[in-house]
């Protein structure tokens, strides 16, 4: 397993990015200013994008694992990689996600704790309703962990 930074042609991984953020113009808002990594294990299995949000905060804007590779530790490996890579450069790793039964437990298992909520984020910023595991996403839940 190898994790490497992607510095150009980030849109080559659009199909994977859209697994985590299904509206392309929302991905475009952070993709170019963000730092992107892919996890390879006999081919690309997962990706993540992080951005500098100031005040010592690194935000995980997008993390996705190919559907047939989920549950194999690739997502956790990316989070662990980010913590190891950015320790000393940032004090907090944060992520914003929907209040979904598939994402919140994953982030909590990676050491994140709920921090704050942005009301109506998904209804205000997406042009269509977003559903995850049958749950209509409305509010953005922010979780943080120290690094």
Model-derived segments and spans:
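Conserved acetyl-CoA pyrophosphate-binding loop and the N-cap/start of the following alpha-helix
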Residues: 69, 73-81
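Short hydrophobic/aromatic beta-strand or adjacent loop that forms the aromatic wall/cage
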Residues: 34-36, 137-142
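Conserved catalytic-core motifs of GNAT/GCN5-like acyltransferases
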Residues: 94-96, 108, 113-134
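Short secondary-structure capping/turn micro-motifs that flank functional sites
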Residues: 33, 101-102, 122-124
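Acetyl-CoA-dependent GNAT
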Residues: 4-67, 79
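Conserved GNAT acetyl-CoA-binding A-motif
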Residues: 86-98
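Conserved N-terminal entry element of GNAT/NAT acetyltransferase domains
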Residues: 1-9, 141, 147
């Amino acid at each position: 397993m190898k994790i490497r930074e992607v510095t150009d042609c980030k849109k080559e991984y659009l199909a994977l990015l859209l697994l985590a953020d299904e509206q392309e113009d929302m991905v475009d808002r952070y993709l170019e200013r963000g730092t992107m990594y892919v996890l390879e294990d006999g081919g690309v299995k997962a990706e993540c994008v992080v951005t500098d949000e100031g005040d010592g905060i690194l935000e995980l804007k997008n993390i996705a694992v190919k559907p047939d590779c989920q549950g194999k530790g690739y997502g956790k490996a990316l989070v662990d990689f980010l913590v190891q890579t950015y320790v000393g450069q940032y004090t907090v790793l944060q992520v914003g996600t929907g209040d979904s039964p598939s994402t919140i437990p994953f982030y909590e298992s990676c050491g994140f704790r709920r921090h704050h909520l942005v009301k109506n984020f998904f209804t205000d910023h997406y042009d269509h309703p977003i559903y995850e595991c049958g749950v209509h996403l409305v509010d953005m839940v922010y979780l943080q962990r120290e690094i």
